[in-house]
Amino acid sequence: MKKQMKNHETYAGAVWRRFCRHRLALASLAVLVLICGSAVLAPVIAPYDPEAIVGPFGAPPGDEFLLGTDQIGRDMLSRLLYAARTSLFAGVLATLIATALGVFLGLLAGYFGGLADILIMRFTDMVMSFPYILLVLVAAAIFKPGLWSIILILGFVDWPGIARLVRGNVLSLRETNFVKSSEAAGMPAFHILFSEILPNTMAPVLVYATSVMALTMLDEAALSFLGMGVQPPAASLGNMLNSAQSVTVLTKQPWLWICLLYTSPSPRDRSLSR
């Protein structure tokens, strides 16, 4: 038992050492941790209520308001922290929904094959045949605008890629000796799926899921920018950007947060995939 733990720790240490050699991945991880930490601690570190009018209209950055105020006098730093919180919440929850649905359907299609594989994959192909942004916009227009609507829409639109990835892995894994041995021993199909096959498919799924999370955060911001997502006075990176379309405001305010939040997972993903 101790030897197994030692081997596990050695493998984890080797993974961490390889990750640390990738400087861009470390930098992206640091940025992501900073943004996530600020978002999670927003109720503690935000100086003002993000929806309260606390100062003059359009005040420049200063000692009292570090990032200034918006057009109606709300503190920009507080709104930025809560907006990042909203984007992270939407991204994580939508990714969990998409991953759970995609993994489940991919396992069923890959392991059982036959009619189940045909039905699931043809439905997957049908969903993927629609232009992604058009499908999201149509769904967002049908349902009432709001954070939960966007989370559910993105969660139920982003699963096909994960399903195809899992199915491909399952098709190769079901021919391996350990799966054949479990089948010969009379193990139930769902035990084999979730105890033998699923753990061996999680590495590529996790890498893919982090990319999906970045895309869902960007999609949430885009829909909020168009007025189909988070509604004012609630703070979102999208509706904050919509209210700051003048070039003067864009050059003075830290809107690069949305770019950092979207791009920081990518170098980390490439490092993990190695």
Predicted regions and their residues:
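Generic hydrophobic transmembrane alpha-helix motif, especially the helices
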Residues: 66, 70, 76, 97-101, ...
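Short, membrane-interfacial amphipathic segments enriched in basic
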Residues: 1-13, 64-70, 74, 190
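Hydrophobic alpha-helical transmembrane segments of membrane transport/permease proteins
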Residues: 38-72, 225-235
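Transmembrane alpha-helix signature in integral membrane proteins
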Residues: 28-29, 76-111
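Conserved small/polar residues in nucleotide/adenosyl-binding loops
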Residues: 262-269
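Glycine-rich helix-loop "coupling/hinge" segments at transmembrane-helix boundaries
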Residues: 139-142, 170, 219-258
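Transmembrane alpha-helices
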Residues: 85-101, 190-222
